[in-house]
Structure formats: C-alpha cells, structure tokens
Amino acid sequence: MNENKEFKPYIPAEKVTAEMTVTSVIMGVILAIVFGAANAYLGLRVGMTVSASIPAAVISMGVIRVIMKKNSILESNLVQTIGSAGESLAAGAIFTMPALFLWAEEGLCDKPSLVEITLIALCGGVLGVLFMVPLRNALIVKEHATLLYPEGTACADVLLAGEEGGANASTVFSGMGLAAVFKFVVDGLKVIPADVSAAFTSLKGEIGMEVYPALLGVGYIVGPRVASFMFVGSIVGWLVIIPMICLFGPDTWLYPADPGVTISQLYAAGGAAAIWSKYVKYIGAGAIATGGIISLIKSMPLIISTFRDSMKSMKGGSVKGTARTDRDLPMNFILIGIVAMVVIIWAVPAIPVNPLGALLIVIFGFFFATVSSRMVGMIGSSNNPVSGMAIATLLISTIVIKSSGQTGIDGMKAAIAIGSVICIIAAIAGDTSQDLKTGYLLGATPKTQQIGELIGVVASGLAIGGVLYLLDAAWGYGGAEVPAPQAGLMKMIVEGIMGGNLPWALVFIGVFLAIGMEILRIPVMPFAIGLYLPIYLNATIMIGGVVRMFMDGRKNVDEKTKNDQVTDGTLYCAGMIAREGLVGIALAILAVAGISLDVSGVVNFGNIGGVVLMIIMILTLLKFSLWKKKKA
C-alpha cells in the first residue's frame, strides 16, 4: 500500500538519537521485574492482569525527561518495551504453572524446581519474540492502516505527550505510595480486616468486600461493564447456588467434600466460603473452560483468516532496506534461536517434555504467535483469547500425550509444561506486536526493540520462579489469598482427560450456565471468573467500576477534561496495582521468614474500619483524577 510506504514516523529514519542506553536498559529491567512480579500477584488473586506499557512509559518519561533532564522519546520507548515484557511473561506463566504446585500439595509429585520454572518461562518468552519478528513487516508495516494495535497506539500517544510526563509520573507514584500504606495497614499490621462481610443466616448466603487498593484499581481500569458481569457471577454463586445447595441437600454428602461430611456440617464449620470452596469453584471452572472455548470458536474465522493473511504477507517478503526503521534481527539469528529453544525444551531433563511435546510446541507456538500478533492489532491485548488458546493446546496435547502412552502424573506434568510454553508464547507475541507498533509510530529501530523484548523476557523469566515459589511458601495456591483460578482450571482439564476423578456434574452445571450467558449475549469470561472467585473480591472490583461509571457519565464537563481526568485515574490505579503487588510479595517474604507485624490483638478497628478505609481509598482516587489540579 502506498499510504504505508509514505508513512513518516515522529523521528525520521535518517535521524539517529539515543535509544538503547545504560539508563534505558537498567530502568527497563527494573520495571520488567516490578511489573512482572506485581502482575503475577494480581493475576493469581483475581485471574487477570493489566497492561504495563502505559505506566512504564509514563514512569520512564517522567524520570528521563524531568529528573535526568534528557529529551529522548526513543529511550523512553525502549524502557516501556523492556518493562512491558515482564507483565506479559507473568500473565502467561501464572495461568498454567501453579498447577504443578497444586499437584505437589496433593502429594502426586515434587514441586517444580526453580530451574524448571525459569527454563519454561525463558523458552516460551524467547520463542514468543522470535516467532513474531518475521511477521513485523507484514503486520506492522504493510498493514499499518488496517491493524490499529490500540494499546500500542495509545502508548505512542502518551510518549508523544511527553511534556506532561512529570505530572503524569507523579500520579503513578502517588498511587504506588498510598497503596503501600493501605496494603501495609490491612495485611501487615492487620489493624483493619482484609474483608468486610455480612452473612444472611436464613438464606445461607454471604456478601462482603475486600479492602484492597489493587481490586479497586482493577475495577476502575476494566470499567463498569466488565466489573458488573464479574459481580453478577459472584451473586449467582454466593446468593443463588450456595443457598440452593444448602436448602435442597442439608443432610447429603456430595463429592468432593470429605467422606461423611454433610452439606449442613460443612456450612456449620466454614460458612458459605466452605460450600464455595468444595462445590461452587468447580461450577466456576466449568464456566471458565466453556468461556474460553466459546471465545476461541467465535474467533476461529478471524484466526483462520489471520493466519492465512499473515502467511501471504510473509511470502511477499520484506525488503531488506538499509533504513534504520526497517532493520530487524537477522533471520539466521532467529532460526538458530528457535532451534536452540526447542532443543533445550526437548533435551534438558528439568523440563518434562519429550520430542513429541517439543514438536507440539513448535506447531502450536508458531500458529498461536501468528494469531496473537494479528488479533491484538484488531481487538487489542485485553480481548486476546490467550486463555482459550491455552485451553485448546491443553486439550489437544493432553490427548496426544495420553495416546502416546505417557499417562499418570508424568503425562499431566508434560501437558502443563507444553501449555505453559504456548501460553507465554502467545502473550509475549502479542506484547511484542504492540511495542513494535509504538516504535513504528515513533520511529524506533525495530532491531533495538526486539533486543529489548529479549532483555525484558530474560529479566522477568529469571525472577518469575522466585515469585511463584515465594507466594506458594507464604500462602499456598488455591486458597483465599492466591486462588490461581486459571491454573486450577488447567489442572482440572488435564486431570479430566487423563482419567482423574472430577465432580463432572458440577463442572457441567458451569458449562451450561456459560452457554446460557452466551445465548443472553452476556460476556461469558467475566461472568465465569466472577462465579469462580470469592464474592468479596469481585464486590471491590465492582466498586471501582462504579467510580469509573461516575467519571465517564458526567454531562457537565467537556470531553477533553473528562478524558484527561479518566486517564489520570487510570494511571493512579496502575500505580496502586503495581505497588500492592510488590508489598504483597514483601509480606510474603516476611511470612516465610516467620516475621509477624500483626498488632490486631492490641488495635483492631473491625468492619467499621474497613468501610472507612474503602471510603478513603475512593476519595484518594478522586483526588488524583477528578480533583487533580492541572498546571497552567
């Protein structure tokens, strides 16, 4: 297309400016680890992660422009390129790998070693970048006018508005600072309860909220629509299904409860939470699996056309121009890198994958990297059905592995390892595409960005194993603190195919609930996640969504002012999410070390304190968005 060939980036190709410097690499690595760790914690708690590109861009612009008095937009862009890789790798890893810890907890196997987790993360991340590089010319350049890459374009807009970098960065840092205080008060000192709840004794239901800044921030960022669907899922679970179970079968024993323990005894011992843990979670898991499959089926025409169009574009070849903005990593480096990763996956004993598994990774990896890279350009990273791709991979790979004679826990571990690598490949390929779109608009050097992506992958890949081990040691997966919803689902799928005992009746209730939601045109995944996770958690997300609805719905404010205020709120919430994750990890370190800061025995403000703290958190969000003073 001529319009694409005539596109002029912000920094012309002939102009050479600072890009990969010691400053940009160090800052990028720090942000990759920070956002990777924070998103790992968030994803294991609520089943979703948030994009790190814009917060990383704002922080880098604020530090480089305002503090260091430098003026290099491409340097800031490389920081966010490296930094955002951490979030994407964490998203891929946490959806699958905690399943290995869950099996270890059940005594079926040993916990995965740090070497195993690190190698799986690194191989998946590196393959995600390398599989995407040959697609850059086809997707980013040739289809510049067609594929918008929403997050990549938005990130470029933020960097281009760099004169506000200092003010915007201060908003992110304010969110980080206040979230640290809130989190420390609740989970460190424990002077305010983590959740405020009210039980409906006659109904046998329960409602409440968790007093956490990150959940409020997630609700604000995803908006009222998604937050409300999640909350509806929780209402169905906690105020409809749990009361029905208690009403119709109080004296019944129902698998998977402990033998002989009736439903009424279970409720008497643990309340609605005990019924949710034993029964409703399986209904939610069935709904999540169905939601992922429905998402994949609905996307199938787009997936097929995406893969076909990408292959056609690649056949056209990329012109080996000498322009700085047209330089990619050399193809021989890419091919050698891909072969090296596949050999490591196959040959290293720490990764439980045989040659057949390595072949499946190559086939599914390249296919889903291609699909992910193009789909995020059309519908954005937030709507990219990575979980659906992971479910499809697990279904097929588990069937193939079982058919080859590899059964039992060894076969299940191999299936999860394959699913982990594919999930990370898809997440990283999508992130790389968004970052390269940002670079294309700004005039960055693709090769430099691709190296930056690899640096971010290595940095976060080396850290993710420690984060997963730490959270497991502190609280264990599958509980209230880190429920790890997607990993629990992947575990259930593999066990079901391999012949494990599952409460299939409960799972199929979730399946048909999800199908009903789809018929009603209610987005299945938010509803299913709400059904799977505790109502306290989703209620707080709903509160954040209501705040966003108020911000979006004001009629007496001009659109520019409203958009600026909403964006300030998003940046503040991104800071809260990042910092709560880091404080959570710090508290996990203290828990493992046996150090307690708990003073609740001396000072405890009870439920009233929780309500007051939630009001304070809402007011601080409004302070840095609605009531933020702009510089003249």
Name what the model sees in each region.
Residues M1-A632:
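Alpha-helical multipass membrane-protein architecture
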